[in-house]
Design a protein with these regions (language model features):
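N-terminal cationic and glycine-rich segments that engage phosphates or anionic surfaces
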Residues: 1-250
Length: 250
């Protein structure tokens, strides 16, 4: 924290973010080493080359997806009616309401992970490993057991994780973006969306578009966050570099 604050004070950038990025990037060489050791080294030349191509293709695809999530915007056109102020005609301007594809950022993933890990942390703190059904529930909440072909039942925890991501994507967006307030402000300022009546119809229209965009963003977050678990579970890879890390870096 202290180092991050000093970086911010010197004007280099957001200190905390820079520290997080450095910490995340420092794990990349080890993750790549683990992947190459498992899928490339000791394999036939053709198999090794194919593995390298697939690994880097997946990495590039994830980076592109995260960039789209972070920078993708749906612009809703807004037009302002002309009106007389004194002897001058004012208004008639055009603007837009930018709706980001990933309105909630990395928050849904962080909240979902925190909720999934909370029971495990509490049990670990009190020294309780669980017995019977509770032990199975704890395994289902542990991402280390997800996507394993030999233990498919524990992947139900992954389904819960996905549901939580979708829930928090909508929940966080509903807190930070209020279509009704925006529609009221537009109406007061003489603004309107072409083809949509001011007031509640505008609010309903914005809410409809927002729900669609949030769903797309949530699907993107799910893909980015689940891929590392899939590789770790199905192929036994040791990848600590997750979707959260990639979103923070980009």
């Amino acid at each position: 924290m202290w180092v991050g604050e000093r970086i911010t004070e010197k004007g280099i950038g957001n200190g905390i973010s820079i520290v997080l990025v450095i910490n995340i990037i420092s794990r990349l060489p080890q993750d790549l080493s683990n992947l190459f050791e498992q899928f490339v080294f000791g394999k036939a030349p053709a198999t090794a080359i194919l593995a390298v191509v697939i690994i880097f293709a997946i990495i590039i695809a994830m980076v592109v997806l995260v960039i789209i999530l972070n920078d993708g915007v749906r612009k809703i056109p807004v037009q302002y009616a002309k009106k007389m102020q004194g002897r001058k005609m004012v208004g008639g301007q055009t603007s837009n309401i930018p709706l980001k594809v990933n309105t909630s950022g990395v928050i849904p993933i962080i909240f979902a992970q925190s909720i999934m890990q909370f029971p495990i942390i509490i049990c670990s703190f009190i020294g309780y490993n669980g017995t019977g059904v509770w032990a199975e529930i704890l395994k289902g909440l542990n991402s280390g057991y997800w996507c394993k072909p030999s233990q498919p039942i524990y992947s139900l925890g992954l389904l819960l994780y996905i549901v939580l991501i979708v829930f928090f994507a909508y929940f966080y967006t509903s807190i930070t973006f209020n279509p009704l307030m925006i529609a009221d402000n537009m109406k007061k300022q003489g603004g309107f969306i072409p083809g949509i009546r001011p007031g509640k119809p505008t609010s309903d229209y914005l809410n409809k578009i927002l729900n669609y965009i949030v769903f797309i963003g949530a699907i993107g977050l799910i893909i980015v966050s689940v891929i590392p678990y899939f590789f770790n579970g199905v192929f036994g890879a040791s990848v600590s570099f997750g979707g959260t890390s990639l979103i923070i870096i980009v």
